[in-house]
Amino acid sequence: MSDTKTAPAYDTPIGLTNPPIDELLERTSSKYALVIYAAKRARQINDYYNQLGDGILEYVGPLVEPGLQEKPLSVALREIHADLLEHSEGE
């Protein structure tokens, strides 16, 4: 008997695998700078969503169209990949 199992088919992954890490690293001086850069932007996106109910518009929302349940870090990485943000070292 041949009992072969195939891997389940998934949609194209987004977030930490898409955009590719190698392409993201081309936009910063080191992997550590990329982590800080993406984390700060993800925090801004998260704060933007938290302030919406209060009517305060202090933070800038996502610059790319977020997916239905896409995390702020994934959105931040896609913004970095699309060169929608300016970053300077030491901020």
Curated annotation (Swiss-Prot):
Coiled coil: none annotated. The keyword Ribonucleoprotein does not apply. SMART domains: RNA_pol_Rpb6 (SM01409). Its EC number is 2.7.7.6. It is an enzyme of class 2 (transferase). GO terms for molecular function: DNA binding; DNA-directed RNA polymerase activity. It catalyses: RNA(n) + a ribonucleoside 5'-triphosphate = RNA(n+1) + diphosphate. InterPro entries: DNA-dir_RNA_pol_omega, Pol_omega/Rpo6/RPB6, RPB6/omega-like_sf. The keyword Coiled coil does not apply. It holds the Pfam family RNA_pol_Rpb6. Keywords: DNA-directed RNA polymerase, Nucleotidyltransferase, Transcription, Transferase. It comes from the Bacteria. GO terms for biological process: DNA-templated transcription. One of its GO terms (cellular component) is DNA-directed RNA polymerase complex. Promotes RNA polymerase assembly. Latches the N- and C-terminal regions of the beta' subunit thereby facilitating its interaction with the beta and alpha subunits. The RNAP catalytic core consists of 2 alpha, 1 beta, 1 beta' and 1 omega subunit. When a sigma factor is associated with the core the holoenzyme is formed, which can initiate transcription. Belongs to the RNA polymerase subunit omega family. NCBIfam families: rpoZ (TIGR00690). This is DNA-directed RNA polymerase subunit omega. It comes from Nocardia farcinica (strain IFM 10152). The gene is rpoZ.
